[in-house]
Amino acid sequence: MATIDFYFSTLSPYTYLAGNRLEQLAAAHDAQITYKPFDIQALFPRTGGTAPKDRHPARQEYRLIEMERQAKKLDLPINLKPAHWPTNAAPSSYAIIAAQNAGGGDLGTLVQSILRACWAEEKDIAEDAVIRECLTAAGFDASLADSGLLAGAETYGQNLEDAVSAGVFGAPFY
């Protein structure tokens, strides 16, 4: 069975806009997805990138135009300037890592619900209640938000190192 390494950030609007197309592609080709959330804010300086807030105003403006265009094309609701962005991506990423390790639910649905919470629902994905709600909606035990924090932190850090080694420079990256 083929495996797809999916590097992403729960803060990334482009990961949100990718929707569930990866999961559809994997299902159509009998491939397995390894979800690898990483710290995109730490990735940018290590790979020659610039965080959105530090980009030239013309680039910032065009980014919003392109995000709106893509959201319309994909028929996805989007708030171009979410109230809780950027926020701490670590808690939601740790929950995804814990859910992947635990199994039993729908990981793609979990990832999409966290991204949707940030980019369409004005929720703070660093908040425990939001993470628990997303876990439950995807068929996972909400207590995963609390368990595996140490393992989640270790894996989250390793995912960043793996991303740099693999030539990842943004999110999503496959």
Annotate each language-model stretch with its function.
Residues 4, 10-31, 101-104, 109, ...:
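C-terminal cap of thioredoxin/glutaredoxin-like
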Residues 10, 17-118:
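Structural alpha/beta surface segment adjacent to cysteine/selenocysteine redox centers
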